[in-house]
Swiss-Prot record:
The keyword Lipoprotein applies. Pfam families: DHHC. The lineage of its organism: Eukaryota, Fungi, Dikarya, Ascomycota, Saccharomycotina. It comes from Debaryomyces hansenii (strain ATCC 36239 / CBS 767 / BCRC 21394 / JCM 1990 / NBRC 0083 / IGC 2968) (Yeast). The gene is SWF1. Residues 26-64, 125-198, 271-377 are cytoplasmic. The chain crosses the membrane at residues 5-25, 65-85, 104-124, 199-219, 250-270. This is Palmitoyltransferase SWF1. Residues 1-4, 86-103, 220-249 are lumenal. It is an enzyme of class 2 (transferase).
Length: 377
């Protein structure tokens, strides 16, 4: 096996492993495992690198470096896809069996697949995710209700200098508050929010189609050319015959590895749709679940307090060096009252039985809300 081919395979495998750890390492099934800890280290390294880049950018490049560097990943993605397509048409296509090359269906579907990947990438990259401005903030604020558990009334974005509606979040990369914020996608250098979630899902599905159909065509090409080397295994045919077979093998391996990641990631988002949460909200609900596991989350019953839920914690009373049980606000962590104040509380024992996600309207309606949304501004 030649060194370049070895390097390519190692890079592909390492990239797939790292991407999988970052995407799925935060799953409850991986908590307190080496995978979860490695994910934290990767994110910490990423945070330190970004902090260093921001420092250099602000002191040397006048805050322009971060803006332009955000386009490196989308540019890399487009270059890789374009290069792979070039390799396919110059080295793989001629190896395809005649029933594929002479088929009007396959010719049309190849064109359709390429068209979809570039259109969905363009739309996911450049469409408005749902930027909140002074002109539309009132409409957005009235669209989603605060549940006083993960979203709170009268929250204020100090950067945008506007109120922060429920289900929104300020993106430090885009420097905008985004309606129904899901996450910032580095692959398209854009936030995924209320208006462009449909294009993001289209981007994922287009990639699954490209990888799945591309893998099928590469397998057909390998099966066709394998007849010329009956004494060699598929692996030997890939690494020791000619450049066309090597390119076909590399593309097939890429498709097999990355379609699994794309399918799992798309399945994760379908699960979020089923649960009626966004990626951002899933993290918030995880914090709520953690409080429940500690026995620290309580619902306020029959009180004049402007709080629906509070967190129990123990603090030290420095006046007499004793410890005191108090209840703090989930919104700002201010101490609201102590256990001796006689406030009527109900302990939250279970996420499923004691809490209601007011944003979950059922899978079909959740899907309609994200895919067929109405324009507010």
């Amino acid at each position: 096996m030649s060194l370049p081919f070895t390097v390519i395979i190692c890079i592909v495998l390492l990239s797939a492993i790292l991407i999988s750890i970052v995407i799925f390492g935060n799953s409850p099934n991986f908590r307190n495992t080496p995978i979860y800890k490695l994910r934290l280290k990767i994110l910490r390294w990423n945070h330190d690198i970004i902090a260093w880049i921001n420092y250099v950018d602000s002191h040397v490049f006048g805050n322009k470096l971060v803006f332009y560097s955000g386009w490196l990943v989308p540019l890399f993605y487009i270059i890789v896809v374009s290069f792979c397509l070039h390799q396919f048409f110059t080295k793989v296509y001629k190896l395809l069996p005649l029933f594929v090359r002479k088929s009007g269906f396959h010719s049309t579907y190849i064109a359709f697949t390429i068209l979809c990947i570039f259109i969905d990438t363009f739309m996911a990259t450049f469409s408005n995710p749902g930027k909140i401005t002074t002109g539309n903030v009132d409409k957005v604020d009235n669209f989603f209700q605060n549940n006083e558990l993960i979203f709170f009334a009268d929250n204020y974005c100090s950067t945008c200098e506007i109120i922060k509606p429920a289900r929104s979040k300020h993106c430090s990369i885009c420097n905008n508050c985004i309606m129904l914020f899901d996450h910032h996608c580095i692959w398209v250098n854009n936030c995924v929010g209320y208006y462009n979630y449909k294009w993001f899902m289209g981007f994922l599905i287009a990639n699954i189609n490209l990888l799945g159909y591309g893998g099928y065509l590469c397998y057909q090409a390998m099966s066709s050319t394998k007849t010329e080397f009956p004494t060699l295994s598929y692996w030997k045919t890939i690494i020791s015959t000619n450049d066309s077979n090597k390119a076909t093998g590399v593309l097939l391996i890429l498709c097999v590895i990355f379609i699994m990641i794309a399918v799992l990631f798309t399945g994760l988002h379908l699960r979020y749709l089923y649960l009626g949460v966004t990626t951002n909200e899933c993290d918030k609900w995880s914090e709520v679940e953690y409080l429940i596991s500690l026995g620290s989350l309580y619902q306020v019953i029959d009180s004049n307090l402007n709080e629906k839920y509070v967190e129990k914690c123990v603090i030290m009373n420095h006046d007499n060096d004793s410890y005191e049980t108090v209840f703090i606000s989930l919104k700002n962590e201010n101490v609201l009252f102590s256990s001796n104040d006689g406030i009527n509380l109900r302990k939250i024992e279970s996420m499923e039985d004691d809490l209601i996600n007011i944003y979950d309207h059922g899978f079909v309606d959740n899907l309609k809300e994200r895919m067929f949304n109405r324009v507010l501004n």
